[in-house]
Amino acid sequence: MGTSLIGGKGAQWVQALNARHPWSHNDYFHSWILANLPSRRREAVDVGCGRGGLVHSLAPYFDHVTGVDIDSDMRRRTGLACSDVTNVTVSERQLDSWADESVDLITMIAVLHHLDIDDTLRHVERVLAPNGRLLVVGMAAPRSPRDLLWDAVSIVTNPLIGFVGHPWPSPAGKQPAPFPVKDPVLSFDEVKRSVDAILPGATMRHRVGFRHTIEWAKPG
């Protein structure tokens, strides 16, 4: 879940509630991604594909989808999740290996803070085709008063979302993270400075679930 309000105590409280009424802070945003797909849909790349849920959801909308992850177990899980579709490739390729303007959609969920942000965004700008889209669900370290306010909102809404989705307490209790985790280092404002400098016109917003979103359409 990452860094949170009140020296981490808020995060500990939320984690305890989330263990009783679990929901995925990352999967929650799949619907946002599916609602913002580009008009041309040849190739999509999900960077940091994890267990493959988003790759599987994108498959019906694109000619081909590539799920990328450096973790071999995550690639294995994505392969299993997508075993019923024929237009998916799972790979450890990195963005720098794609040709210029060859991809219509690049997605990243809770991944960008693992990467060198400036290098990654430059590769995104190069690889995306005209009118292609970048859709990011990210995490940032809370530092400004606005960041802390959004953390407070997430602390309040987190158990409500979990309770609505899973009204009965989970008997399993707290489970280990299903994918490698890392707390973010850059703040929202620091991420935004890089985004604005490299991807002019991108939209970045705070969201619930201790997340933010970045949306950018490459000029046609």
Q: What residue spans do the PLM features occupy?
A:
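Conserved alpha-helix/loop element of class I SAM-dependent methyltransferases that forms part
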Residues: S24-R42
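Conserved class I S-adenosyl-L-methionine
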Residues: R42-G50
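Class I SAM-dependent methyltransferase SAM/SAH-binding core
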Residues: R51-G53, S57-D96
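C-terminal alpha-helical "lid/dimerization" subdomain adjacent to the S-adenosyl-L-methionine
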Residues: A141-S194
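A conserved beta-strand element that flanks and buttresses the S-adenosyl-L-methionine
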Residues: T107
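A short, conserved alpha-helix within the catalytic core of class I
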Residues: L115-V124
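Class I SAM-dependent methyltransferase Rossmann-like catalytic core
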Residues: A11-H25
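Conserved beta-strand signature within the Rossmann-like core of class I S-adenosyl-L-methionine
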Residues: G132-G138
